[in-house]
Amino acid sequence: MKILFASSESYPFIKTGGLGDVSYALPKALRKIGIDARVIIPKYSDIPEYFRYNTHHIASFGVPVGWRSQYGGLEYYEYDGVPFYFIDNDYYFKRSGLYGYYDDGERFAYFSRGVLQAITYMQDFNPDIIQCNDWQTAIIPVLLKDHYRNYRNYNHIKTIFTIHNLKYQGVFGKSVLGELLCLNEGYYNENALKFYDGISFMKGGILFSDKLSTVSRTYAEEIKDPYYGEHLDGLLRSRSYDLWGIVNGIDYDILNPETDKDLFFNFDSSTLYNKTKNKIELQKMLNLPVSENIPMIGIVSRLVSQKGLDLISCVLEDLLQDGIQLVVLGTGDAKYENMFKYFAWKYPNKLSANIQFNNSLAQKIYGASDMFLMPSKFEPCGIGQLIALRYGSLPIVRETGGLKDTVRPFNPITGEGNGFSFTNYNAHDMLHVIRNAEYFYYNEKYNWNKLVQTAMNDDNSWSKSAEIYRNLYMSVL
């Protein structure tokens, strides 16, 4: 079985979020179970020089973009046993950053067409399935069925479209149809690409792919509801039978507290005293009062309302009256950045506000904190809570999307669970659950440590999800 994983980003070359992690870790896990999975991404100029200068050039070819033919280069690099292809074009990809340009519609129309053109030149690899990811590659199923269906190398290829975040849909003007995609006016209707007064790449992926998937079971149900459906819920309900919810995992080779070089001390579930040493060292590093007994709550997040920052803002001063330390890492909306800066000034012994993104510090926070706060308004899957579980930082989450699927609320009667959760999007519900966790930490330390061990021993690797993806692939062949 041969899978081509088309994505706009991938670790270790370039990433802005969870899609970049998935684009590497899932193909890696698939290859471990005998599936020939390969990845194709744009060759951005922001990719580190070591990688850019060591790719192997395979072919040069033309890529139709409307009436024009643009240069396309196909390059190859193998990393950690995973084959990667790159589409090279300086005009579209020799820029700072990945997204947010006025011509993003043209850039990713070009990339999508380039992926299909490149298949002819992949020598020993002809995919059975192209797995497309988010709006940047969502138009591939449309182009495949319209422009390539009669070609021998293409007429057997199936497509799966994976929705990582329905909120970002790739909506552009009607002129994109003919000028960039070479598609006729027949596609400009409610049963095709038309979306209000424009066209939606995301809608094309949902309508024209053979199967759909998204990144958790709960999110697959949520996006069929108008509250989460971003005006595509009706379309998703109509394809409900074809929609699979498969929770993401994390790469246990990389995210491993036993070997993580960013930690002060390595540890596992049987050496939790070393986790406590990490807390003490982080307290010293961040100029917080040093105490192994005070519970530390970590937040590693974009500082935006979607991540529940509006809830935190409502009760932050109340929370800082408790016997806790709060360590925050992230950037985002100025109002939330300034909020944390102000309260860090007002409560320097309680709050450390690190308004930056620093991966090494993030790992230290996961390794040192006792609890990890993630009260998202919506969360398709979420990776933070999975890393927190792996590192023994008990998640406190709102029950939405992948948070609901991966964090089992602690039951004080049975002792079951691996974290804490609340249902309603309500600041005082959140505060109540945080204080329940604080009480448990202070008054039942033995049982707290047992809960930490349960969390660390959970399997949130990609191995289970890779098997479910195998079943999804088999269902379309």
From Swiss-Prot:
Residues reported in the UniProt entry to bind ADP-alpha-D-glucose: 15
GO MF term (any one): alpha-1,4-glucan glucosyltransferase (ADP-glucose donor) activity
Stored CDD domains: GT5_Glycogen_synthase_DULL1-like
Keyword Aminoacyl-tRNA synthetase: no
BP GO annotations: glycogen biosynthetic process
Cited InterPro entries: Glyco_trans_1, GS/SS, Starch_synth_cat_dom
EC number: 2.4.1.21
Enzyme class, spelled out: transferase
Reactions that this protein is recorded to catalyse: [(1->4)-alpha-D-glucosyl](n) + ADP-alpha-D-glucose = [(1->4)-alpha-D-glucosyl](n+1) + ADP + H(+)
Entry keywords, A to Z: Glycogen biosynthesis, Glycosyltransferase, Transferase
Pfam families, A to Z: Glyco_transf_5, Glycos_transf_1
Pathway: Glycan biosynthesis; glycogen biosynthesis
Family the entry assigns: Belongs to the glycosyltransferase 1 family. Bacterial/plant glycogen synthase subfamily.
Function of the molecule: Synthesizes alpha-1,4-glucan chains using ADP-glucose.
Protein name: Glycogen synthase
Species of the source: Clostridium acetobutylicum (strain ATCC 824 / DSM 792 / JCM 1419 / IAM 19013 / LMG 5710 / NBRC 13948 / NRRL B-527 / VKM B-1787 / 2291 / W)
Lineage, opening ranks: Bacteria, Bacillati, Bacillota, Clostridia, Eubacteriales
